[in-house]
């Protein structure tokens, strides 16, 4: 498109583009933004444990059911499930022949959907084929893809598979709706591999109408640090994880929607002046800790975006520990230089599921829009999720709430590992009690006819006492392990991420107690702001070997000051 045509398109969109509240019969102009406060009823997800021991899910394990006998005694039935009203997950793993249609060679995504909802799994072969076939399609796409409206834009998913199912209910069937996902499909939630397999199967089935961008979590560094690698190894294998990493390297970094909107996971970079700079990037690699590729995935708008105290275009992102904060001035400068209407991004949880930032003075349209599609993020944020539907120059924000999902113990811990310290403590207590049934006088008594000498009797008594002391020490060790295990589980339950604060575990029992100070077991996180504050440490880039110098130490640091000609790009 020529520059004149782009200007005409932007001008036309600026006057006609509107934001409409879903379900509302009345549209508003670009100066007003609304949303659908739609509290759709949640579909009930099947809860239960998996067929192996590595997936302990609340209320579904085999256990002892009871019944009353005469005299008030209780009969225990160890062959029946305690909660038999919840369907047991399918033990059968779908095969390659079952997953893929022999005629079309494409996966049966509807079968996968129903199987995953029941917590079923598939064999490694079809899992690898889905990931690799999807990667082959992604590899053919440009680094910045072009998408025409109508399109539904979705933000972070973060392994919340059951909420992803709700998203498609709200947004429309992928068979008839064009979708653009802005990244962060994995980590934090406990159903990340299901999200990847299902989205990749949709990509294979609808390659021209379903588009996937890369988020900052689609990399080896973060998936090793958070939960995705562990999830793949528990549910499938490390080969599946490695295939996912290779596929993530193929994901495009940005999309140009309708020649009007730049869609990206994070935001702008001081090294990206124009759209062509994005097209020239080499994306087929692990994202670096600094540079334009890192910025597209990691950067954020300033918290006081639109009300900045200074004229800096970019400042160091102290919240993420990498990349930059970009200002309203930097955003407007980029939009004007590239004939764009707005930037649509994800990357940050929003209480309402979305946020419209200050409008551009030249177009009257929000210069920046954040969309977030993981409701009740981490099960504690209490936020709504949203998708953005853009059609006929009308922007429609649709919100939705979270759906029920099966429960996993923190870090995919199985029930036997979780209960072992408690069981060990009780077993050693019983053993100590058994050995303590005889008194000191009884220890001196010998049942044999030949009496022992004083030295032999004293030695035997000391041997038995040493055994009792050793078992007592073992009991105390198990007691400490049990207490620490309970503290760890309790502390994980009190933090939004299910992860321990840094250094809490290495310091032992006292560190755990200190970390729990300020946390009340009866306290429940009730506000979005509280959850976001507690979770801030987990939004930073984890330490890595190629960490760049801080802005003050970097001799090649880009100029952060905006100028008359947009010189803030450095």
Curated annotation (Swiss-Prot):
Enzyme class at the top of the EC tree: hydrolase
UniProt KW Metal-binding keyword: yes
Catalysis: reaction(s): O-phospho-L-seryl-[protein] + H2O = L-seryl-[protein] + phosphate; O-phospho-L-threonyl-[protein] + H2O = L-threonyl-[protein] + phosphate
PROSITE patterns listed in its UniProt record: SER_THR_PHOSPHATASE
Family: Belongs to the PPP phosphatase family. PP-2B subfamily.
EC number: 3.1.3.16
Domain of life: Eukaryota
Residues covered by region (Disordered): 1-88, 530-570
Cofactor section: Fe(3+); Zn(2+)
InterPro entries from the UniProt entry: Calcineurin-like_PHP_ApaH, Metallo-depent_PP-like, MPP_PP2B, PP2B, Ser/Thr-sp_prot-phosphatase
GO biological-process terms attached to the record: calcineurin-mediated signaling; female meiotic nuclear division; meiotic cell cycle; regulation of embryonic development; sleep; wing disc development
CDD domains linked to this entry: MPP_PP2B
Keyword Iron: yes
Expression sites (tissue/organ): Expressed in CNS and PNS.
Residues at the catalytic site: 217 (proton donor)
Pfam family membership, one: Metallophos
Polar residues bias locations: 553-562
Cofactor, free-text remark: Binds 1 Fe(3+) ion per subunit.
Function text: Calcium-dependent, calmodulin-stimulated protein phosphatase. This subunit may have a role in the calmodulin activation of calcineurin.
Protein name in UniProt: Serine/threonine-protein phosphatase 2B catalytic subunit 2
Any one Gene Ontology molecular-function term assigned to this protein's record: calmodulin binding
GO CC list: calcineurin complex; cytoplasm
Natural source organism: Drosophila melanogaster
Binding, Fe cation: 156, 158, 184
